[in-house]
A protein has these predicted regions:
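Flexible coil/turn and secondary-structure edge motifs
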Residues: 1-178
């Protein structure tokens, strides 16, 4: 079975993870850190804004079921790519909108995805395309957060359901049947 990986940063990784784990063809979503200068960063370090890392998700997907372009379209529809270094009340470079292509084809697709999404937003897209770098999985308690603690977390309850509603409205045909 062919599997590919996509790494996307779009604000809080709990919120982004909840969206992508709902998609058919996505085998796994892991929260983590990428794009910084500190080896093995902790959540506390990344939240401090001094490591250069973004909170991101690493998506493992079946390209025969869902394409990288489809993932990018969902990504741009379910976060605000016009906000520089923030998503809502989450402010700092760790919450930046960034794509970390894993190969040249993904870089080309990311550029095209930004161009496609530009028509859907009233302000310029500030999403960056950053070089692939070392991926650091977040601590275990951050993984599949929405499925557990997230549904008791007031922040998540305010942010994630509207993202999931956008996903259901715009990408119903891409949702998991289970």
């Amino acid at each position: 079975m062919t599997r590919e990986t996509a790494i996307l940063a779009g604000g809080c990784f709990w919120c982004t993870e909840a969206v992508f784990q709902s998609l058919s063809g996505v085998d796994g979503v892991e929260s983590g850190y990428i794009g910084g200068t500190v080896a093995d960063p902790t959540y506390k370090q990344v939240c401090g804004g001094d490591t250069g890392h973004a909170e991101a998700i690493r998506i493992t997907f079946d390209p025969n079921v869902i394409s990288y372009d489809d993932l990018l379209d969902v990504y741009f529809a379910t976060h605000d790519p016009t906000q520089l270094n923030r998503q809502g009340n989450d402010i700092g470079t760790q919450y930046r909108s960034a794509i970390f292509p894993q190969n040249d084809a993904q870089t080309v697709a990311a550029e095209a995805g930004i161009a496609r999404a530009g028509a859907d937003w009233p302000a310029p897209i500030v999403t960056t395309i950053e070089p692939a770098s070392t991926w650091y999985p977040a601590e275990d308690y951050h993984q599949a957060y929405w499925d557990g603690e997230g549904q008791r977390n007031p922040y998540c309850m305010a942010v994630i359901p509207p993202k999931l509603a956008k996903l259901r409205k715009g990408f119903a045909e891409r949702l998991r049947a289970d």
